[in-house]
Design a protein with these regions (language model features):
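Canonical Rossmann dinucleotide-binding motif of NAD(H)/NADP(H)-dependent dehydrogenases/reductases
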Residues: 2-34
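Active-site-adjacent segment of SDR/Rossmann-fold oxidoreductases
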Residues: 29, 149, 172-182
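The beta1-alpha1 cofactor-binding region of Rossmann-like NAD(H)/NADP(H)-dependent oxidoreductases
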Residues: 40-41, 61-72, 105
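Substrate-binding pocket helix/loop in short-chain dehydrogenase/reductase
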Residues: 98-100, 104-109
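Active-site helix of classical SDR
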Residues: 123, 162
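Residue(s) in the substrate-gating loop at a strand-loop-helix junction
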Residues: 144
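SDR active-site lid
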Residues: 179-249
């Protein structure tokens, strides 16, 4: 996807953080932007921000775990813009610092239904719209560096499970959509200045309500996020990756050694397997 002016994008989790950074980058390139977010109090400010860049902006209060609501959002977006060219599955939650041996049913339900099934719901609703006009398009799925390796220490399991799943799903999606002229990219941000670590404070009642403070993000991860990349810079990286049809998008090189360590363990296992005799 090389041309952006006059085309349209739909972004989940778009009213703040990385999502808003992408919205600003796309708007600056001339795209019409639909911003969907569960945090309704942020939508009006985000709309004004995007419209100030001279493009149309549609805002939709949306819980991506609600498949029916996602389909309604797709219908509303096409009614407003006519066509859809770019889908960004960016909505996500994290911050439950609870080891897997202590995790509760609703912890799993919440994170899986937002991080993984939220993306699935959007793919089901929006891919037909991307295919319909025959002009091609692009899909961004936001995973995490935690989808490439697990941070040290207990309590990261549920989040990492969903982010690893997004990596596999997106790698398969690229193969499925490539013949149709629809590009796919996998965004794996490291630490970016977002409110993700605070998400458990706002967990919906249907998933158990706010998480107890003792089980929210540990202080070291929260501090790292607070000093991370600016969301606008992340948005610019994404725009550039779409232009260049890049699949993997990482936000910095600081995780190289830790990611390499995981693949070194895999390589060692391959070498051991090659030596096995029965």
């Amino acid at each position: 996807m090389k041309e952006f002016d006059g085309k349209s994008a739909f972004i989940t989790g778009g009213a703040s953080g990385i999502g808003l950074g992408m919205a600003r980058a796309f708007a600056s390139a001339g795209m019409k932007v639909a911003i969907a977010d569960i945090k309704s109090e942020l939508l009006s400010k985000a709309k004004a921000d995007i419209e100030a860049r001279g493009v149309e902006c549609l805002t939709i209060e949306l819980d991506v775990s609600d498949r029916t609501a996602v389909r309604q959002a797709a219908t509303e977006t096409v009614a407003a813009f006519g066509k859809l060219h770019l889908l960004c599955n960016n909505a996500g939650v994290g911050g439950i610092n609870r080891p897997l041996d202590e995790a509760e049913d609703l912890d799993w339900d919440w994170v899986i239904n937002v991080n993984l099934m939220g993306a699935v719901n959007c793919l089901l609703a929006f891919i037909p719209l991307l295919k319909a006009h025959g002009e091609g398009g692009h899909i961004i799925n936001t995973s995490s560096v935690s989808g490439l390796r697990v941070y040290d220490g207990r309590g990261q399991g549920i989040y990492a499970t969903t982010k690893f799943a997004l990596v596999g799903m997106t790698e398969a999606l690229e193969q499925d959509l490539k013949p149709l002229g629809i590009g796919v990219s996998l965004l794996c941000p490291g630490f970016v200045k977002t409110e993700l670590p605070n998400a458990p404070r706002n967990r919906p009642a249907k998933f158990g309500g706010p998480v107890a403070p003792g089980h929210t993000s540990n202080s070291s991860l929260s501090a790292a996020a607070a000093s991370g990349m600016e969301p606008d810079d992340c948005g610019k990286l994404v725009l550039n990756a779409i232009k260049n049809d890049e699949f993997y998008i990482l936000t910095d090189g600081n995780e190289r050694d830790l990611i390499q360590a995981r693949f070194d363990r895999l390589t060692e296992a391959i070498e051991r397997a090659a030596e096995v005799t029965f």
